[in-house]
Structures are given as C-alpha cells and as structure tokens.
Swiss-Prot record:
InterPro entries: Choline_transptr-like. The gene is PNS1. Keywords: Cell membrane, Membrane, Transmembrane, Transmembrane helix, Transport. Belongs to the CTL (choline transporter-like) family. This is Protein PNS1. The chain crosses the membrane at residues 64-84, 112-132, 140-160, 164-184, 211-231, 257-277, 315-335, 352-372, 418-438, 446-466. Probably involved in transport through the plasma membrane. It is found in: Cell membrane. GO terms for molecular function: transmembrane transporter activity. Residues 1-14 have a biased composition (Pro residues). GO terms for cellular component: membrane; plasma membrane.
Amino acid sequence: MSDYPPPNYPPPNHPQYQQQQDETYHVRPDMERQQDFGYYEKPTPSQNFDDSFKVEKPKFNDWPFAIFFWLVVAGFIAVAGITLNALRSTYGFQGGSIYGSGNTFTLNTNTIILFAFIIVMAFILSAAIIVFARLAPKAFIVTGVILNVVLGIGTAIFYFVEKYYSAAIVFLIFALFGAWCYWSSRHRIPLSATILTIVIDVMKMYPSTLIASFIGLIFSAAFSALFSIVIVATYVKYDPNSNNEACSVGGGSCSKGKLIGVLVFVFFAGYYISEVIRNVIHVVIAGIYGTWYYLANSDQGAPKHPALSSLKRALTYCFGSITFGSLIVSLIQLLRQFISILRSNFAADGNGWGVCGMIILDFFVGFIDWLVRYLNKYAYCYVALYGKSYIKSAKDTFDLIRFKGMDALINDMFINTALNLYSLFVAYLVALLAYLYLKFTKPEYNSGGAFYAPVIAFAFLIAGQINRISLTVIESGTATFFVALAKDPEIFQMTNRNRFDDIFRNYPQVLEKITSDH
C-alpha cells in the first residue's frame, strides 16, 4: 500500500476530475453536493466482524415479518404431514416405481421419481457451472449466451417436430431474446469480464463463499425435493375423484375447492421459503465480499470468520428484513401463477381475447417482479453490511439507482444476464428431460396429454430456482462490489490500482461516489 499515495481530493466545486502526472484519477467525494459532511458509514478495521460493520443500537429489524414467515413454515409442515401421510397410506395404490401405479387420474410416484431426476440433474449442472465460472470468467459470459441461444433454438425445433407448438413458441422466444441480448451487448463484455474476474478472485481468496453457496444448494435441493413430493401428495390427498382411496385417510375430505386452496398455499409457501433461503445466502456472501473490499488490506487485517458472522447477522437482526423483501417477491410470483392458470383456462375455452389479455397482464406483472428483485438484490447488500431495516435499505438503494442506475443496469445486463442464461440453460435441459420422461414412461394419468404443461412448467421452475440459488455467490459478489465501489471507490483505487484502472478505462463514472445515508 505504501507504493500508492492516498487520493488528493479536488475542491468541492471543481467541475472536472483532476489528473496528476502519474495518471491517477482522483475520486470526487461530493457527488450529490450535499452538506452532510458527517456522513461516514465506512467500516472500521477490527478483528471482529460486528465491530467492523457496526450496527448502531442493534435490534431485530422488521420482526413481524419474521414471525409471519415462521407461521408459514409451520403451516407448510402441517400440510406436508397430512398429505404425506395420505401418500404413505395409499403407497401400494400409487405404485412404488415408474410403472405399475393403480392411480390413473392424477400425479403419483411416477412423478416423484421424475422430480428426483430433475433435482439431481439441476444439482450437478449447477455445481459444474460454478466451477466453470471460477476457471474461465470471460468464456463463462460468452459461452453462456451462445450456448443458450443454440440450445433454445434446438429445443424449439424439437417441440415443433413433436407438434407441441405452445412449448416450441415459448422456447423460440427465449432463444431469440438471448440472441438479441448478446448482439447488442457484445462490446461491453470486457468490462463484465473484468468485474467477474475480480469476483472470482475473491472466491479463490475466501473459499467460504463457495462453501456458503454449496450449503445453500444442498438446502435448496432438499427443500425442492420436499416441495415436489408435497405437491404430488396434495393431489393424491384432495383430488375428488371417486376412485381416490386417500379421501378416507385423516386430514379432511376431498373436494375441488380444498385441492385448489391447499395448492395455492403450498405454492406460496414453497416460493416464500425458497426466496428466504436464497436471500439468506445472498446476505452471507455479501458480508464476505464487504469484508474483503474494506478490510482485506487494512493494517489490522480482515475480521476472522466473516461467513459465520454474516450468517449470525442474517439469522438475527436482519432476518425480518430478509423475510419482508422475500414476501413481496413471493406474492408477485403467486400472482403470476394465477395469471398463468387463467391463461390456460382461456386457451382451453378457445377465448383468444382472454389469452391476449393474460399475456399482456403477465408482461406487466413480470416487469414488476423483475424490478422488485432488482431492488432487493442491492437492498440486501445494505442489510448485510450495515444491518439496516428493509425500508432504510430500500431508500439507500433508490439513491444508488438515482445516481448510478444506468451503470448498475449495464453491470447487471452483462454479468447477470449470463447468470440468468445459465439458469435458463439448466431449465431447458431439465424441462426437456421431463417431457421425454412423460413421453417414454407413458403414465396413465397423462394418457390424454393433460399433464405435459404443468409437469414441464414445474420442472422448468424448480431447476431454475436451484440453479439461481447456486449462482447467488457470483450475483451477490457482483452486487456487493458495485455497492461498495459506488460508495467508496477510493479504497479500491488505493488497494487494487491495476484493477481500478481496468475498470476506469471502460467505466469513467467509477470516480463518482454516493454519500447519502438513511
């Protein structure tokens, strides 16, 4: 650090960045021209994480949402107990393998085995993607885009040949959109590769990032397995078919209304719990990256065990904030599921105008879903580093978007688009596996093809969710790095001069810093 002199800040009203003879560009500290010179959230060097990232007046933020979450978990466990008991009691009727089920009217053990294949395949592909990203960051971005375009078009062609036109059109749209993203953003890939390389280097320095991601992947896969079985068991327990033996098992009688009501709750709880798992991992990894950015090169050194300290904060003071933001996303996901069901019903009735209306509505709700997820990603970085409530973190995020919005969006377009495309890649393969499985095993409940759409859609959803959680380590590292770079770029300039210069060449706005605090 002695080789790099500290930044010599320009006067507050100086309109240009100053450049000395050593070609060092200095950071403007007063981007917003505010008068609150008392601002300083910068962590202080210490061997203790809580002392470095100090929380003033520690308290359990947003605790009512944490209580609500645990009530949802309790409800899910209760439903799981009732439905799994019905599945166990009628196990011989459902069948114990791929073939030989007496249940010919709804999902059975044939589907459970399919979901097991789906989860294992998604798990293996997710682990392989993390290894690839660590070994070749630039190739990770380029290959991710190209591979998804090729696979998407190939899958669409396959479905066209099979005359499964609805799936073919959906996959073709995804493929064409991926091609457009690559073509329009190819000149920005060097900046993305630089940032991704930095994130991967930190992964190498802190193996706890990978350990946290792997543990999250295990938890997500385990919950996905339980979620999948509970969905099947719910159909088994509450389907009102006269041949359903599970109706006589404890837990209430069968009816269409009960089936729909329980499924709505199960899907909501599944979305909610999955989101909380994902965001807890995000907060833990954000704490590790924050430790590296601010304290790795300090005289005192970085705090010990940042992952455990971040996990402790995520599950105590910050847990209510995590469940708050996750609830918003889960409700939006549930609304999108309702829209999808209505669209399917309109299509079955031949109501073209209804289908068009639902497609338009789904587009707007999908945009809101993307926007909330986008804001949550950065808000949770503030939650992780400063222990703030969800609302205060959201306000800080709005300031970040207000002054760095386009920069953050561009940053996300290149790295996170690649991550999302890898998630789509996994989902493509798993959805194709689900289709082929149903086609070749020919379960009786799908003799008319009525279960192709829901099973394939669920396979696509669950595989994408597992993969997104596994890639949280990269997404969280990128978001945390951008937040820290926006608030304190001079630290990175002093401690990582060459990397900072690489970023500056592609992103001169890095010299502007945000000084607001809520």
